[in-house]
Amino acid sequence: MVSTVSQVSRTASHDAGGSAAAGLAAMAASRVMVESQPKIAVRNLDFYYGSHKALKSISLDVHERQVLGMIGPSGCGKSTLLRILNKMYALYPGQRAEGEVLLDGENVLGKDVDVNVLRSRVGMVFQKPTPFPMSIYENIAFGIRLHEKLSKAEMDERIEWSLTRAALWSEVKDRLHTAAAGMSGGQQQRLCIARTIAVKPEVILLDEPTSALDPISTLKIEELVDELKRDFTIAIVTHNMQQAARCADRVAFFYMGELVEVGTALDMFTNPREQRTQEYITGRFG
């Protein structure tokens, strides 16, 4: 593996994006990926905004207890795909999906699927932190009450568990009943992650979760993602190549509504099969 990275570093040094590509390769090579079966299987998926076809015949797997990084220029369809995985698009008239999104073999695009159950199994964290206008405690308890009836002691235990998993408990344990709006941006985003995992989903979708955060808060979120994949399947949309190399086990590159290429992070950042992938990764467009 080291020799592969060295080879890429030497080859990449001949072009303008060489040093950046070599750095991405080194980051990807440092990750340890455990092989697993697909948790979500997307098959022949087309998606429409009215008459506009935004996604074209997408087929890809999201492997269990791995991180799938989704990269590509703005408007390429990666965030659209993320919202299809837990049927968020159904909230908006005129949007429709054709094909299959199989969660443990069940097509979640079917009309008889209970979207509330689906979204408890496949949780989502958005680009901008979205704490509810209530206390830190109630931000997490709110979602739990929709799905479970817990005693006060059980609720307290679940909230401590979720805040601990989100690397936030030590920072807020003495002010749980104060307004979440008083937290920093990075803390608010970790609160949103805690709120998501509090209902014990199987999959976590992250849509550019650090784009509005400072570098220190970004690092905390990235470390958290690496920790959470031990128990959750994760898909993350990012415009940051370094973040994809640091966080993702597999990477999917999208361009103009098409899935151009998907592979391990190491393969994608050292030896992409498609010229468009190479050009995007090295910053020649995007």
Curated annotation (Swiss-Prot):
The complex is composed of two ATP-binding proteins (PstB), two transmembrane proteins (PstC and PstA) and a solute-binding protein (PstS). ATP binds at residues 72-79. InterPro entries: AAA+_ATPase, ABC_transporter-like_ATP-bd, ABC_transporter-like_CS, P-loop_NTPase, PstB-like. Its main location: membrane. The lineage of its organism: Bacteria, Pseudomonadati, Pseudomonadota, Alphaproteobacteria, Acetobacterales. It is a peripheral membrane protein. It is found in: Cell inner membrane. SMART domains: AAA. This is Phosphate import ATP-binding protein PstB. Belongs to the ABC transporter superfamily. Phosphate importer (TC 3.A.1.7) family. Residues 40-281 form the ABC transporter domain. Its EC number is 7.3.2.1. GO terms for molecular function: ATP binding; ATP hydrolysis activity; ATPase-coupled phosphate ion transmembrane transporter activity. It catalyses: phosphate(out) + ATP + H2O = ADP + 2 phosphate(in) + H(+). Part of the ABC transporter complex PstSACB involved in phosphate import. Responsible for energy coupling to the transport system. Keywords: ATP-binding, Cell inner membrane, Cell membrane, Membrane, Nucleotide-binding, Phosphate transport, Translocase, Transport. GO terms for biological process: phosphate ion transmembrane transport. The keyword ATP-binding applies. The keyword DNA-binding does not apply.
